[in-house]
Amino acid sequence: MTILCLILAAAAPVSDLKATARDGQVFLTWKEAETTVDVYLASEPIADLTKATRIGHHLEPHSARDWWEDPASFKKGEPHGKPVGFRIQDGGERLDPSGGLFVHTVRKAGKLFFALTSAEDARVIASTSVVAAPGAIRPIWQRDGQPPAPGVGKGKPLWLSLHAKGGVVANSEYLLFGDETMGWREGLPFKFSVSVQNGEVVVRPTDRVWIGRPHNEAGDAGTPAIWTFWFGYNSNIFDRKLMASGTPVNYTERRNLWILDWVRRYYQPDPNRWYCSGSSMGGCGTVSFGWQHPELFAACHAHVPIVSYTYLGKGSATRLEPSCWTGHIAPDLKTSDGVPLLDRMNATKFVAETGNDLPFLFMIHGRQDGSIPWENNPSFYRALSAAPGLRGLLGQRDSFHERQGCPC
């Protein structure tokens, strides 16, 4: 009797791994099956993972898909759009959305060796190498044709516009893959808009970050692209079970500072005429970010902002809980800067300790606003009045938030 044994070779989970170096970054692309991978880096071929550094983790299947172009990324229950890949060269063709993508920011010049491993069993499934060098990373133009010429905004005022919660800046002109300081892992993509309108350089970032899971603890969200109240989020946001061992980090502020520095160098606006404004969550960011950077902004306009995140009244501090922690935020919960989170997000305390070197502030609140608690505001205004030399304008209405129809 003859027994015939037929062995079928399993298809490789990753193939055609390529590495391209430019502008201080390495772009890794590959074809894949339904594969979750980690990325490792070393200065020699990787045979032993203990001698390499893990630089990317929790990369989901089809990481080359441009989730920014999918409405379901931002609104719970929204149907998915047609998958499209990221555009990683100025005005270039999009990647195959079924493939993989990871972007590494180079810290040391030389030949770099990369390996992809299966997240399930840490088995090396692909490797490659490339010669690369550090450099000034830059955003990628997302429109057809060529980006604006350097200096197109020379001498013009700059306006940083921060959107409200639930918002997203559609058709943004630029895409950047951040370094390890800008997110819970290296290579996270974020988009932003810069345009010259009516004699101004208008900068509109988007307060969204991909966490690879539904953000169900945020009752009004549940999407995998979360909002952060223009501050940041927990360093372990990718896994709810690990957040208690993580740290609140101002990733979003770091992204905004990078954007503004790049716009300063490329568009060349007048450094003495920078302004920041926003409504609702955008107003919150105007106070917690813009107003607290007097070296950047001459004036700020905050429409119905939270000025201090506390548990007074309806408890505005609860807005930080879903992204920064696992529940009630204790007074001693520290950020990555070693400052208690609730102190860092307390503009009343900031005014009392800073003195008078702050931007001009225009602010509007509603006493009966159902979304932004009034309880924090009187002490803030008293602190403004007590601080020498501070200038501001205050407008008040009842239920201003609802009458304007602003989400928060």
Stretches with model-predicted labels:
Residues 38-110:
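Recognizes extended acidic, P/S/T-rich segments that occur
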Residues 271-325:
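Primarily recognizes the serine-hydrolase "nucleophile elbow" in alpha/beta-hydrolase
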Residues 11-35, 121-141:
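Pro/Thr/Ser/Gly-rich low-complexity, intrinsically disordered linker/stalk tracts
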Residues 163-199, 204-215:
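Short, surface-exposed "cap/lid" segments of acyl-processing enzymes
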Residues 95-105, 109-111, 119-176, 187-192:
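A domain-start/cap signature at the N-terminus of enzymes
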Residues 161-163, 308-406:
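The feature captures the conserved acid-bearing segment of alpha/beta-hydrolase catalytic domains
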Residues 27, 111-115:
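Short, conserved beta-strand segments of beta-strand-rich sandwich/propeller modules, principally
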Residues 237-268:
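Alpha/beta-hydrolase active-site loop
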